Amino acid sequence: MSQTQSLAVKTRAGLGKGACRKLRADDMVPGVYYDAKGVNVPVMVEHLPLQKLYSKIASSHVFDLQIEGETKPALVWKVEHHPTKPRITHVDFYGVDLTKEIQVRVPVEVVGKSKGQVKGGQLEIHREFIEVLCLPLVIPDKIVLDITNVDINESILIADVVLPEGVKAVYDNNYAVIGVLASAAEAAGEGA
């Protein structure tokens, strides 16, 4: 991202369900800013600027959060949506220290058509996100997996995923991110 986005929020005094309902009725979104040092600040933000920012950066980019005139680097940490309307009902911001690594989820994008799919196999995506550890300013937008060389009954494991410099995958077990399985008809034919 070439230019850091910014979002202005205000601190809020009213806490609880009733106060939050009033904010939402006034086209405001209640939220909480969690500082890297453990300080929690209840905030409110206008819905439209928040919606625009979230559609541009989601949860994978640092932006400048302006709280009552003070600018702090932050991530959109958690967003709650209305169950039937396209509205954000609550947002959590996480203040980051730009010099310390953080753990975040990054979406996986699969490109290409595998050898196994060409032969009739089924692509199975096991993980849509990968947990990574990196500095806040080098969080990748997405992790692209080229699957053109994956054959039937083969997988791409997390240890095989090529990540940008300064980004490390977080995992205990070497799990499969994607795999190509034999189709049901092929599997039945082999068993007969």
From Swiss-Prot:
One Gene Ontology MF term: structural constituent of ribosome
Keyword annotations from UniProtKB, A to Z: Ribonucleoprotein, Ribosomal protein, RNA-binding, rRNA-binding
Keyword Metal-binding: no
Name of one Pfam family that matches: Ribosomal_TL5_C
Functional summary from the UniProt entry: This is one of the proteins that binds to the 5S RNA in the ribosome where it forms part of the central protuberance.
Entries under NCBIfam families matching the protein: bL25_bact_ctc (TIGR00731), PRK05618.3-1 (NF004135)
HAMAP family reported for this sequence: Ribosomal_bL25_CTC
Name under which the protein is recorded: Large ribosomal subunit protein bL25
Gene giving rise to this polypeptide: rplY
